[in-house]
Amino acid sequence: MVLYCRVSLNAFVESFRNTSGPDSFFTLPAKGLMHIVPQEEIEYGLSLLRESIGLYEERKRIPVEKSKKAMPFFRQDSRMLVGPEIGMYVIPLYEEPGEPAQSAEPSLVLELDYQSLGELCLFENYSLLSCKYEKEPILNHFTAQLEKEYDTFFFDEEHTGFTPDSRFFSMLCNACLEVKQPSSVGDKEWRLASLQATDEVLYRYEHGNLIPYVPISMPVDCLKRVYLEDFRRQPLLFGTLNGFLKSKGLPAEQLLNLS
C-alpha cells in the first residue's frame, strides 16, 4: 500500500536540503492542524464528541444539572484545546493522487510507502491515522471510551480539568485529527500526526500567516515515486528535477515519473 502527499516545488526542494544519498533522510513540515484544516471541520469532530457525552449521560441517567455536555473544549479566546499546552501537527496523506493542484506554482506528488511510514511512527512516536467519515461508528466509539473516561474530567461554572490518569485530552485530539464530514469520504485521507508542546515547535511565515510546524524526517527509502504534475507546461522542469535528485545521490530515473 502507498499513500500520496502533495507538495509545492519549493517545499520539495527544501525537504531534500540535507539529503545525501539513499541511506539518508528527507524532511517534510507537519503543520499546525488548526491552521490548515477548516474551522467547521474541527467543530464537526468535536460536536460528535459532545453528542457522545450526551448519549452516555442519557444511558447512565445522569441528571441534567450534573451534565458535562456543555464543557468548553477550547481555552478562552483561543483555538487551543483545554488541557496540556500541546498542539496537533499533521502531514495530510491520501490513498489516491487526486486532481492536479490549481496553483500558479508547480506542484509534485510524493508516493510514500505505508509500511515504512508505520515503522517511522513506531520509532519516533508519531501516529498514522486514517480519517473516519461515518457518524454512527464514531459516536459508538466515543461513547464506549466514555465508560472509562467520563469520571476523569470535570466541568463546572469555575473550573474545567482532568485527573492525572485521564485520556480525555486524547479523545479531544482524536475528534480533531480523525473525524471528517461524511461528504468528504471521497478524500480517503490519512494524517501523519505529531503532538508537541507549543514551545517546542518551529514557526514560518506563509501566505500572510504565521504557521507553527514540526519537521518530520523520513528515510529516503520511504519515498517510492515523485510525480510531476502538468509537466508539459514546463518542459525544462523534468530535466532539472532529474538533475536535482541525482545531485542528492538518489536514483532519479527510478523515482521521477511524469504524471
Question: Where do the language-model regions lie?
Answer:
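NAD-dependent ADP-ribosyltransferases
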Residues: 1-259
